[in-house]
């Protein structure tokens, strides 16, 4: 996740660590090196825990990271695992106080009887240190696994969503939250869908959307009522009966939902497609992009190896003109909304020497395979790109492929 200026890039891993990369200042003005990032700070955000009431282990794995807009010299970010959201402050220190009266240089207290002179403490320069400190811990509000966090445009509140509920928090208050959506039925046997993702509108602090495992998107307005179980708008595409199959419901489940920067459009990702919806048109998306339609014939084996339940994310570029999402075999896809052109690129160690140009990849479905094409049957489904990020104003992208992070910039002639 890039911060709002794009100077920092935060990543979370399965071990509960957050690693922040900072853009190399010297390389910014050098055209061919402008996308260089180096490690800025690493800290342990979450530890493994155990829920003794339910006899369940709580993984430390980071599910989501969201930056807050910068208000002063320090940076603030939210990170969450399955149960607990934390607010972190990341700040720099290049001076330290020296010359305390009651403490010696090691920090031990001195006997007041030995103090004969009064000193004024002074600040001395020291090597730059980046400190990460937890400022707030928002816990005990989610029975189910948290899948989304989203910072509101009022910068005072944020929401966290799990499978059945969405809670609204104030950054200053850790011991209570407002439940704004609750889709849990009185009888759990009647449960037909779960919440898969949620996000606030980028400009209107009262509006948010959430998506479901049934492929629907609900837009809610908090001005209408305190509990937003009744939506303001309901986006759903009618199903084509000719495409109906055993897997229809599974592959229509939405894994990610994102507002465009302008706030006019919503992008959703299901298993095979990315769809763009206009907020003013609820009955069908205005654009549908096939991410990997060649997998339609492979759904049976993808179901058997559980890949069909993978949750791919999607991102907009800074001007909302290009969208990006991941696929298998370390492939990721980009779709240009204006020219309707699309490209498949690969993030792998074999073909990405520093500053090497990525070649478009093609997947062939049957018949004769050209030399530069890859056959559907030889795709590696264990190598998947679920998480991607796009710099807010430049063509610099970050792609997470298993335990590698790749940063690419657009080619300059």
Curated annotation (Swiss-Prot):
Family per similarity comment: Belongs to the phosphatase 2A regulatory subunit B family.
GO CC annotations on file: cytoplasm; cytoskeleton; membrane; protein phosphatase type 2A complex
Organism, as annotated: Oryctolagus cuniculus
Classification of source organism: Eukaryota, Metazoa, Chordata, Craniata, Vertebrata
PROSITE patterns, per database record: PR55_1, PR55_2, WD_REPEATS_1
Sites bearing Phosphotyrosine, chain numbering: 265
GO molecular function: protein phosphatase regulator activity
This protein's UniProt keywords: Cytoplasm, Cytoskeleton, Membrane, Phosphoprotein, Repeat, WD repeat
Gene: PPP2R2B
Protein's name according to its UniProt entry: Serine/threonine-protein phosphatase 2A 55 kDa regulatory subunit B beta isoform
Cellular location(s): Cytoplasm; Cytoplasm, Cytoskeleton; Membrane
PANTHER family in the record: PROTEIN PHOSPHATASE PP2A REGULATORY SUBUNIT B
InterPro entries the UniProt entry points to: PP2A_PR55, PP2A_PR55_CS, WD40/YVTN_repeat-like_dom_sf, WD40_repeat_dom_sf, WD40_rpt
Tissue expression remark: Brain.
Subunit structure: PP2A consists of a common heterodimeric core enzyme, composed of a 36 kDa catalytic subunit (subunit C) and a 65 kDa constant regulatory subunit (PR65 or subunit A), that associates with a variety of regulatory subunits. Proteins that associate with the core dimer include three families of regulatory subunits B (the R2/B/PR55/B55, R3/B''/PR72/PR130/PR59 and R5/B'/B56 families), the 48 kDa variable regulatory subunit, viral proteins, and cell signaling molecules. Interacts with TOMM22. Interacts with IER5 (via N- and C-terminal regions).
Entry-annotated residues carrying Phosphoserine: 245
Functional note: The B regulatory subunit might modulate substrate selectivity and catalytic activity, and might also direct the localization of the catalytic enzyme to a particular subcellular compartment.
WD repeat start and end residues: 1-31, 57-98, 141-179, 190-230, 249-287, 304-345, 380-412
Modification sites for Phosphothreonine: 268
């Amino acid at each position: 996740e890039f911060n709002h200026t794009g100077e920092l890039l935060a990543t979370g891993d399965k071990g509960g660590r957050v690693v922040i990369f900072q853009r190399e200042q010297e390389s910014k003005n050098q055209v061919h090196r402008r996308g260089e990032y180096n490690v800025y700070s690493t800290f342990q955000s979450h530890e493994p825990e155990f829920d003794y009431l339910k006899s369940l282990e709580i993984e430390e794995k980071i599910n989501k990271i969201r930056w807050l807009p910068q208000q002063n010299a320090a940076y603030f970010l939210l990170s969450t695992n399955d149960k607990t959201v934390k607010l972190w402050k990341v700040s720099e220190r290049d001076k330290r106080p020296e010359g305390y009266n009651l403490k010696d240089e090691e920090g031990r207290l001195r006997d007041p009887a030995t103090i004969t002179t009064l000193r004024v403490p002074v600040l001395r320069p020291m090597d730059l240190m980046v400190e990460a400190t937890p400022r707030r811990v928002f816990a005990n509000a989610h029975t189910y696994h948290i899948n989304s966090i989203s910072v509101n445009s009022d910068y005072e509140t944020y929401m966290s969503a799990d499978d059945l509920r969405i809670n609204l928090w104030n950054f200053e208050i850790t011991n209570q939250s407002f439940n704004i959506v609750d889709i849990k039925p009185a009888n759990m046997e009647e449960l037909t869908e779960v919440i898969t993702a949620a996000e606030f509108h980028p400009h209107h602090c009262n509006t948010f959307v959430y998506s479901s495992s049934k492929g629907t998107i609900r837009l809610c307005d908090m001005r209408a009522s305190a509990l937003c179980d009744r939506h303001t708008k309901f986006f759903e595409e009618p199903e084509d009966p000719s495409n109906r199959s055993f897997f229809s419901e599974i592959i229509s489940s939405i894994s990610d939902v994102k507002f465009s920067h302008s706030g006019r459009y919503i992008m959703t990702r299901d298993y095979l497609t990315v769809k763009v919806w206009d907020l003013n048109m609820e009955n069908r998306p205005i654009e549908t992009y096939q991410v990997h339609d060649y997998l339609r014939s492979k759904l049976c084996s993808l179901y058997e190896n559980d890949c069909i339940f993978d949750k791919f994310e999607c991102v907009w570029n800074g001007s909302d003109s290009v969208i990006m999402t991941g696929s298998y075999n370390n492939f990721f896809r980009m779709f240009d909304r204006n020219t309707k052109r699309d490209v498949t690129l690969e993030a792998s160690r074999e073909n990405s020497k520093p500053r090497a140009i990525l070649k478009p990849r093609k997947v062939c479905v049957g018949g004769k395979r050209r030399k530069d094409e890859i056959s559907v049957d030889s795709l590696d489904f264990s190598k998947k790109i679920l998480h991607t990020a796009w710099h807010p104003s430049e063509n610099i992208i970050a792609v997470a492929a298993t335990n590698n992070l790749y940063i690419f910039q657009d080619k300059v002639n």
